[in-house]
Amino acid sequence: MLDIGRVRSALRALDVRPTRAMGQNFLVDSQALAHIVAAGEVDTTPCVVEVGPGLGVLTWELVQRAVHVVAVELDKRLIARLHDEFRDASNLTLVNQDILRTDMVALTGHRPYHVVANLPYAITSPVLRHFLEAPHPPEVMVVLVQREVAQRICAEPGDMSVLAHAMQIRAMPDIVTIVPPESFVPAPAVHSAVLRLRRRPTPLVAPHEEAAVMR
């Protein structure tokens, strides 16, 4: 485990009060971090996009291995801390923006890219769809989500939700590992999972046929 006391102290200093209701959970498990970084294949792509870097725990791992990291954070307090924490990281670009309003072509400069993220539970589905349905989607996405959500996305035909259809049309999903509640501050009420989505070279269904498939 990482130093949970330091994480709590940093949150207090920034007056950030994470809540379970909003799905604000900060990862403090070094083993889970290692799984995310390895699954994200961050050293094989010219650009890695991190969504919600928070206190920079995952960001630190990424800048050690990736060619270029673009970290998108909505909270201005956290962005200010990240600028200070990573002032010497020449391969990191910090962006204070809502990822759901972000143009991925503009963000990545048309480069191939991978996504890694510890996603707030409340915005998991919108963020996944934002990336995979974008004109310039990532080659690989590795996201930390609720275990039940990951299982639904990986469901077999005949037991698939609308979200599972939308994801599997565009990507091949698999669950890398399960992460227990005590790996976070604050601890969520449920287990999480590291979910990997590898983009298909060609979607299984043409865009104009998707509505019929997902009825």
Predicted regions, residues:
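Catalytic cores of RNA-modifying enzymes
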Residues: 1-215
